């Protein structure tokens, strides 16, 4: 197939002249369409001949060749202009349609262009799906065909994970947390305490016993000391008598 020239494909372009938009109506739309800078207008049409001879558009019915007519008008937004080949006063062949929306001229696509575009879009999607499926397909003479998806899993693992920034807490939140922790400590006191850094934690009951000796142990110690004093006194004999010197 021969390559289509961009200048011949007018479906992808538009044309507008802002100076005509305020005065655009059914009587002036053909004059607007026949501007020299309009790429959709054919200079060899019968409209140009009628314009040069200063005749009315009714004379187009008596001529043979390419002509432009106003097919539909919905002022001031929409106008439809048809390009047709006139063969006789009663026989014409439509060639193309153009629509003007808010002063901008477009060429209406023909049925073949619409079908071609839809089929091309569908084929492109199917081809992309097959290419994606073939990238996961593997074959080995001993194993046959199988699907392999580990490459994408490894790529996902290599991607660095974005860490969420921790938002600083407010003063109210910190005071509230401290109050809750103090309340929990009073309800559930700790069973082990580490008195010095590096030492093993000691049960709380044992630390209380070491800090505060019971009164019974003190009394027993006092009794033992009193008994020891009495025993030492009992073991000593009576004082020795000294001899008198005469």
UniProtKB/Swiss-Prot annotation:
The modification N6-acetyllysine is found at residues 236, 241. GO terms for biological process: regulation of transcription by RNA polymerase II. Pfam families: Med6. Residues 191-246 are annotated as: Disordered. Disulfide bonds: none annotated. Residues 206-226 have a biased composition (Basic and acidic residues). Belongs to the Mediator complex subunit 6 family. Component of the Mediator complex, which is composed of MED1, MED4, MED6, MED7, MED8, MED9, MED10, MED11, MED12, MED13, MED13L, MED14, MED15, MED16, MED17, MED18, MED19, MED20, MED21, MED22, MED23, MED24, MED25, MED26, MED27, MED29, MED30, MED31, CCNC, CDK8 and CDC2L6/CDK11. The MED12, MED13, CCNC and CDK8 subunits form a distinct module termed the CDK8 module. Mediator containing the CDK8 module is less active than Mediator lacking this module in supporting transcriptional activation. This is Mediator of RNA polymerase II transcription subunit 6. The gene is MED6.
